Amino acid sequence: ALKENVVYDWDATTRLKQLKPARFNFIADAETTVDGFLAHEAQAVVPEAVGGTKDEVDDDGQAIMQGIDQSKLVPLLVKTIQELEARIVSLEAG
């Protein structure tokens, strides 16, 4: 087996609600608006999805951007949908 400590019952909705989607532009491209997350904020919630360090610079003083691997958010989104669906079914059942 390649995996261990597999858990299927975890609270994705609470975790997902901690993410703060934002609309912004990069300083180098003021004309283009982007919907996304600020990597350093997302890192506090989903550290496995974020690479790099906030405000890191290289030897020449140039910023090294953090990045978010959006695909690592997919399991969190799917689990949240499942949790919300179960909640809807429960509420509709009365």
What are these regions (language model features)?
Residues 1-94:
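Intramolecular chaperone/auto-protease modules of tailspike-like proteins
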